[in-house]
């Protein structure tokens, strides 16, 4: 059973997300939070497989919340839900430690697919976020090293860092470094020694 924490400041949204997950046999809403601070307190006290986070809550939220949760529970996966489809939001969320990014206009089925995929170690982007990243990155991908491009291709295919490392004969740390470089435009294309 995949234990999910839902963090959204709108009760009606949390209730809708709970209804969607109630229709599955492998996803369980283990807790819900109405703020980023509440989510952080819950994560400190409990273990969850995936945290679903609203990008735009008042107070602690967005990229800072992702970073704080990642620092607290590095193995917990995070799916960011947002009304923003622009590539900057998705890229920053992934760089901060999220494993997935969905716009709130995504279909229910895509939410369930995303949760399962990232719980298994993969990465998931909504169609809108992926399209925006591709459009923004049409020339950006050309600045990636061959190895970074290969890591990106496998991330998009849904593989997690461990699987990518095994496939490319790299350590998980090296894969994570490549992932950081891919989603940080200032570092894209700069190769570490020996890569």
Where are these regions (language model features)?
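Short, flexible helix-to-coil linker/hinge segments that flank and couple to helix-turn-helix
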Residues: 88-95, 99-152, 191-194
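Short amphipathic alpha-helix used as the core "switch/output" element in two-component signaling
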Residues: 41, 63-75
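Active-site residues of response regulator receiver
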Residues: 8, 54, 82
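Basic, Lys/Arg-enriched C-terminal extension of HTH/homeodomain DNA-binding domains
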Residues: 39, 180-195
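The short loop immediately C-terminal to the conserved phospho-acceptor aspartate in CheY-like receiver
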Residues: 49-51, 55-56, 77
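Acidic catalytic/metal-coordinating carboxylates
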Residues: 35-38, 58-64
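Acidic, metal-coordinating helix/loop segments flanking the phosphotransfer/catalytic sites
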Residues: 32-50
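Helix-turn-helix DNA-binding segment
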Residues: 134-180
């Amino acid at each position: 059973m995949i234990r999910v924490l839902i963090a959204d400041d709108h009760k009606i949204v949390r209730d809708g997300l709970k209804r969607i997950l109630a229709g599955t046999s492998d996803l369980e809403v283990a807790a819900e939070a109405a703020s980023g601070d509440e989510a952080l307190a819950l994560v400190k006290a409990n273990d969850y497989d995936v945290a679903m986070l609203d990008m735009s809550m008042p107070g602690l939220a967005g990229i800072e919340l992702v970073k704080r949760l990642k620092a607290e529970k590095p193995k917990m996966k995070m799916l960011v839900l947002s009304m923003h489809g622009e590539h900057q939001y998705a890229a920053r969320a992934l760089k901060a430690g999220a494993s997935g990014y969905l716009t709130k206009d995504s279909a229910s089925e895509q939410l369930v697919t995303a949760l399962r995929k990232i719980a298994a170690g993969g990465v998931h982007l909504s169609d809108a976020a992926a399209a925006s990243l591709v459009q923004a990155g049409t020339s950006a991908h050309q600045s990636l090293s061959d190895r970074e491009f290969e890591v990106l291709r496998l991330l998009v295919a849904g593989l997690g860092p461990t699987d990518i490392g095994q496939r490319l004969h790299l350590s998980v740390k090296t894969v994570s470094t490549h992932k950081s470089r891919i989603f940080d435009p200032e570092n894209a294309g700069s190769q570490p020694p020996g890569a």
